[in-house]
Swiss-Prot record:
Record domain Obg: where: 1-159
Record EC number: 3.6.5.-
PANTHER family associated with the record: DEVELOPMENTALLY REGULATED GTP-BINDING PROTEIN-RELATED (PTHR11702), MITOCHONDRIAL RIBOSOME-ASSOCIATED GTPASE 2 (PTHR11702:SF31)
Pfam families in UniProt: GTP1_OBG (PF01018), MMR_HSR1 (PF01926)
Protein name: GTPase Obg
Span of domain OBG-type G: 160-348
Lineage: Bacteria, Pseudomonadati, Pseudomonadota, Betaproteobacteria, Neisseriales
Gene name linked to the record: obg
CDD domains given in the database record: Obg
Secreted found in the keyword field: no
Main location: cytoplasm
One annotated Gene Ontology cellular component of this protein: cytoplasm
A Gene Ontology molecular function term of the record: GTPase activity
Length: 386
């Protein structure tokens, strides 16, 4: 199935049913009062996050969604039936904006999340509501309200813990194949990856993380060159970026340092926040270098690029904010085990910090709530009797 990560749809909530003007008419009751019921409310439109839906392709073909209208009221105090709601299932990670105002309507971050994106109109009032001491036989009633109608822009941002970025043919797809069960296309030409791929790396029965691989970037990507600029948004939700660099390019005219700097520059142009995310350097294809030249080549690259070199003892107890560098061969699995364990250790620390912060916020909220609920004890003067 083609990967579709953007769509534009029109949603229309149902109109509320009209209220009715009616009077009670029964045998032996010649002057029955008003008994007109209200109209039913219009159906609303909801967006529902579904982990079984992977793309927005359905919304490229069906662009208009209309909820059911409410039924009109009836006599004998009968209210109209409300219109049925409709639910639009979307992938987890979908962001919904109002296309006209740019307002954020919903951000679907977890399975089962349900957000109203168009509210149904209220039903009209029947004449039973207008009865008064001075108006015993009201004939007025109100029409139902129109439901919300809006044009929405849907944008899918994949949810992953780690994002891969680099030039085309840097070996990102080969890496994700080597450490996960994902099987993206791999070939010896640029732009083999045409859409984002996700791979789950399982360390044991309880610990795992998700890697996102996007099409390779080229210089000018932030302005629209190449394929990767469309998919950079998929890296915005990741917690760690792996900058994959081909340390041994076939073309002698290709400068790995220049290419690495170009990627960082495109990242900065696209999104300052994305540029500021934790980023590790992964030097791939070291198997293409003679063994006696590897250390010298890597050291020369890091010096020219201006990236700090790690000491041998940095593998344990590393600072999660410190930049790191790994040399691997994704094709031969050389160094990939050490890299995945380092990623898992990093994510364990980050997740533990996030849980700790969430617990602290919950405790603060509970304390504030208790402070509001608990009434202050009345002051007792010294002269009062016990």
């Amino acid at each position: 199935m083609k990967f579709i990560d953007e769509a534009r749809i029109e949603v229309m909530a149902g109109r509320g049913g009209n209220g009715v003007a009616s009077f009670r008419r029964e045998k032996f009751v010649p002057f029955g009062g008003p008994d007109g019921g209200d109209g039913g409310k219009g159906g609303s439109v909801y967006a529902v996050a579904d982990e079984n839906v992977n793309t927005l392709v359905e919304y490229r073909f069906v662009k208009k969604y209309l909820a059911q209208h409410g039924e009109r009221g009836r006599g004998a105090d009968c209210y109209g039936k409300g219109g049925d709601d409709i639910e639009l299932k979307m992938p987890v990670g979908t962001v919904i904006h109002d296309a006209d105002t740019g307002e954020l309507v919903a951000d679907l971050t977890h399975h089962g999340q349900r957000v109203m994106i168009a509210k149904g109109g209220k039903g009209g009032l029947g004449n039973i509501h207008f009865k008064s001491s001075t108006n015993r036989a009201p004939r007025q009633c109100t029409p139902g309200e129109q439901g919300e109608q809006r044009t929405l822009k849907l944008e899918l941002k994949v949810l992953a813990d780690v994002g891969l970025l680099g030039m085309p043919n840097a070996g990102k797809s080969t890496f994700i194949r080597s450490v996960s069960a994902a099987r993206p296309k791999v070939a010896d030409y640029p732009f083999t990856t045409l859409h984002p791929n996700l791979g789950v790396v399982r360390m044991d029965d309880t610990r795992s993380f998700v890697i996102a691989d996007i099409p390779g970037l080229i210089e000018g990507a932030a302005e629209g060159a190449g394929l990767g600029h469309r998919f950079l948004k998929h890296l915005q939700r990741t917690g760690l970026l792996l900058h994959v660099v081909d340390i041994a390019p076939f073309d002698p005219d290709v400068d790995p340092v220049r290419e690495a700097r170009a990627i960082v520059e495109e990242l900065k142009k696209f999104d300052e926040e994305l540029h500021g995310k934790p980023r590790w350097l992964v030097l791939n294809k070291v198997d293409m270098l003679p063994e006696d030249e590897r250390e010298l080549t890597v050291s020369a690259f890091l010096n020219a690029y201006g990236w700090p070199q790690e000491r041998p003892d940095d593998s344990l107890g590393f600072d999660i904010k410190a930049p790191r560098v790994f040399t691997i061969s994704a094709l031969n699995h050389e160094g990939t085990r050490e890299l995945t364990f380092a990623i898992m250790s990093y994510l364990d620390v980050v997740r533990a910090q996030a849980r700790k912060e969430a617990e602290a916020l919950q405790q603060q909220a509970a304390a504030a709530k208790q402070k509001v609920i608990m009434p202050e004890a009345p002051a007792v003067s010294e002269g009062d009797d016990a």
